[in-house]
Every structure is written in C-alpha cells, then in structure tokens.
Amino acid sequence: MKLDLKKLKLREVNEKLQNLDRKQNDRNFTITNPEGNHAVCAGLTEEMNINIKGHVGYYCAGMNQKAQIIIDGNVGTGVAENMMSGKVHVKGNASQSAGATAHGGLLIIDGNASSRCGISMKGIDIVVKGSVGHMSGFMSQSGNMVVCGDAGEALGDSLYETNIYIRGKVKSLGADCVEKKMDKNHIKKLNLLLKEANIKNYKAESFKRYGSARKLYNFKIDNVSSY
C-alpha cells in the first residue's frame, strides 16, 4: 500500500500504521514524499515492511517494535530511538543520537552517523558502514556497535557492558573505555552482524574491540578526575 505524505497528514499515516486493518491485513507499505517530516513511523508495534522513499527528520522509527523499516535517504536526530525490536535500515547518513536508549533490534546505517551514536544503548545492535562522530557509545549499557570506518573523540565514554567494534581509527577513548581482546564468541557475533548488514568485504578479524575497564562502576576517590 502506498502512503503519500503530500496527500495525507503525518498523523494519519502513523495512526494507520499503528492500528492495522485486521480485515485487509496489508503489511507492506511504501511512504512517499516524507520531505524531512519528524517522527515518521514512530511507535509501531506489529510486524510489517515499510519503505520510506526520501529523507526524514527527527525520531524516525522511534520506539519501534517488530517492524522492518527501510529509509531511502538521510535521517535526522534520534533514528530508532528506544527501539525494542525489529530492523531499521538507513540507506544514507544519520544525524546525532542514532539508536539512542534502544533496547533491542538491529539498526543499519549505510553512510556515516554523527555524534552520540548509540548513546545509552541497552541491547540494540548497531552497524555503521561509515564512520561515527564524537561521544558515540556514551554510557552504553549492553548490545553491540559495529563501525566499519573511524570513530571520533571520547568513544565509549563511561560505558558499561556494550561491545564496540571499530575497523578504522579512533580519535580518542572516553573515560573507562579500553581496547579489549577478541575471543571466538566475539568474532562469531561480529561475523553474524556483518552478514546481517550484507557486508561482505570485511572480516571480523580486521576490527578491534573496545569495552569497559569497569573502574567507574562504583565511586572511588582515586578515580574522581575521571567521573
């Protein structure tokens, strides 16, 4: 089913997707003329396939559950924020805070992601085929972040148990973030994520893993300058 945002209001489109017609049971949608609208496809809770033809604004696919969403363009701040499950695939670049606070699902970004990618992530898997900006992975708690390019300043600042895999250069590490060894389980998981993102030209062994040194979990006066 085609949903044209030049003919329909954003509220009408989101309401239709949030309340699927059980009799018609159409679960394949194409959204045209998004023209930078904010909160497109926010709050979806059921299995469906959506293709957004164009650029979108803030919080696209926020709070997503189960839906498979492809964006043929760039996205603004907070794509897939607080996502619970499903898959969001950005064919272009992403602005700041991509995948922020998300608990699950898979976010794929074909281009670059700006600052704070994966901030406070809580279980989502994020794959960025380009590079990420500063403070990416800040206070991230669990899940995996894969970056095929470079990472900006303060990567993984104050993170908990997220695994961050970087293939390129890291400008600097944030507080309590250190390079860690890759074991067989990490390599297996990373190869799986690369496969899911249809990345065939890189192998897991070409990445470095970063994680928490676990020195800031509890307050220690010796570490006060790092808090």
Where are these regions (language model features)?
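Feature marks extracellular polysaccharide-active and adherence modules
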Residues: 32-34, 53-55, 62-63, 72-74, ...
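Intrinsically disordered, low-complexity terminal regions
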Residues: 1-40, 110, 127-129, 134-135, ...
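Leucine-rich repeat
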Residues: 57, 76-77, 95, 100, ...
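Short Fe-S-cluster ligation motifs
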Residues: 88
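Beta-strand repeat architectures
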Residues: 19-28, 39-48, 59-67, 78-85, ...
